[in-house]
Amino acid sequence: MEGEGLLVRKIRSGVVIDHIPPGRAFTMLKALGLLPPRGYRWRIAVVINAESSKLGRKDILKIEGYKPRQRDLEVLGIIAPGATFNVIEDYKVVEKVKLKLPEESQGVLRCPNPTCITRKEREKAVSKMVLVSQDPPAYRCVYCGTTVMGDEIHDLISP
């Protein structure tokens, strides 16, 4: 295609997240705690609604200098299962992971039930959710049985 090329330059080190469903890039940045003011520590490129042969449209994130944590893969898998998470070092991809919904999530998703033991300040119970459906995505709290589905899940990600 004429005029096709890089929208954003390559990064020396950090992460590139590709094949994000359109409209979810900022949800990912928020969940990672990378929106301002904390986000000013890294150079972040956000591409919204780019053309994609696989998805039709997609979002892309490039975060230069960011060192991913294991929790990040779990959080991002909840937001955008199927997206590709690339770790970059010296301009090369050194690790590539296809994000997926975690089978179990401990301390990442908050139970929305106000009477759940994990919501009580006096209790030390950490939230624990198990995947009960891939499509649509759904998680169930192991303590109270509350089930959450779809985009509602994104609102329950703990900071």
Swiss-Prot record:
Q: Which residues bind Zn(2+)?
A: C111, C116, C141, C144
The coenzyme or cofactor needed here is:
Zn(2+)
Classify the source by domain of life.
Answer: Archaea
Pfam families on file: PyrI (PF01948), PyrI_C (PF02748)
Question: Which InterPro entries does the record associate with it?
Answer: Asp_carbamoyltransf_reg_N, Asp_carbamoylTrfase_reg, Asp_carbamoyltrfase_reg_C, Asp_carbatrfase_reg_C_sf, Asp_carbatrfase_reg_N_sf
Q: How is the cofactor bound?
A: Binds 1 zinc ion per subunit.
Q: Name one GO cellular component term.
A: aspartate carbamoyltransferase complex
MF-aspect GO terms: metal ion binding
| Biological processes per GO annotation | 'de novo' pyrimidine nucleobase biosynthetic process; pyrimidine nucleotide biosynthetic process
SUPFAM superfamilies hit by this protein = Aspartate carbamoyltransferase, Regulatory-chain, C-terminal domain, Aspartate carbamoyltransferase, Regulatory-chain, N-terminal domain
What keywords tag this UniProt record? Metal-binding, Pyrimidine biosynthesis, Zinc
Question: Quaternary structure per UniProt?
Answer: Contains catalytic and regulatory chains.
User: What is this protein's function?
Assistant: Involved in allosteric regulation of aspartate carbamoyltransferase.
Q: Which family does it belong to?
A: Belongs to the PyrI family.
Q: What is this protein called?
A: Aspartate carbamoyltransferase regulatory chain
Which organism's genome codes for this protein? Aeropyrum pernix (strain ATCC 700893 / DSM 11879 / JCM 9820 / NBRC 100138 / K1)
Phylogenetic lineage: Archaea, Thermoproteota, Thermoprotei, Desulfurococcales, Desulfurococcaceae
